């Protein structure tokens, strides 16, 4: 039987603090036998404005957030479903809210970009 963990956490405006909290919870899940753990949407940052997300957005396959996810997955031998990670969209002025699945070898094996069909003011 395989064990999956669903992580619940309250994200703060500090990305480093949120990554530390997420690591602690992922580590606990792995120690309890989980082989896969899902982090919540906005686990990295609960910003006050859209600009907050732009300030931490990364290019696909590059940046400290994605490096942290890969390293954490390898270190804990854990598949991670990474809630949402703000990624830059080439040639566009918007971000992708990317749900990334990282295997225990630290490789992104799939990604889903959340899209909104309308904007609300």
Which residues fall in each region the model found?
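Short polar catalytic/cofactor-binding loops
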Residues: 8-15
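Extreme N-terminal starter segment of soluble prokaryotic enzymes
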Residues: 1-5
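A short, mixed-charge helix-start or loop-turn motif at secondary-structure junctions
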Residues: 7-8, 51
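Cys-nucleophile CN-hydrolase/nitrilase-fold catalytic domain and related Cys-dependent amidase chemistry
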Residues: 15, 24-105, 109-111, 119-120
